[in-house]
Amino acid sequence: MRSIFLLHFDYKTCEEEDFEDWNLADGKCLNGAKYMYKRRKQDARCLVKRTFKDMILHEIPCDSCTESDYECSSEFVRDAKGDCIPDYDQIALSDICDKANGETVSLEPLQLIKGDKCKKPMEIEAMNIPCEKILRESSNGKKIATIENKFDFEI
């Protein structure tokens, strides 16, 4: 079997045209960037003849941000349709309405995911949250309680 292989292979060193670009995620933006590696073509009949090194990742930031580059802000949650809607429990626990003195507070429902590399942010329309509708005590002076579980057996 070895002699058949040797008859069809001349130990040629790979040239630049023996390599191709390989794009992660089919060349689509992922975390605000396109990622690409160079790899040897599948049908290339050559040897790289270099000491192995990790492939070099080429990262190209995307020009404009899309919805996939964003997550809901901390005061919002996703609904069944995937839209960010106000999380009134979270808003009640925060001091956002305390600072607004019971008035309406304006919040952006989306925030850019940390570490995202897209260049041009989307225009996000702020939502007005009426603080007077949030029934709660003032968050000032609230205590955090913890409960410790005790077990009456040995492990």
Curated annotation (Swiss-Prot):
Signal peptide: none annotated. InterPro entries: Sortilin_C, VPS10-sortilin. Pfam families: Sortilin_C (PF15901). This is Uncharacterized protein YCR099C. It comes from Saccharomyces cerevisiae (strain ATCC 204508 / S288c) (Baker's yeast).
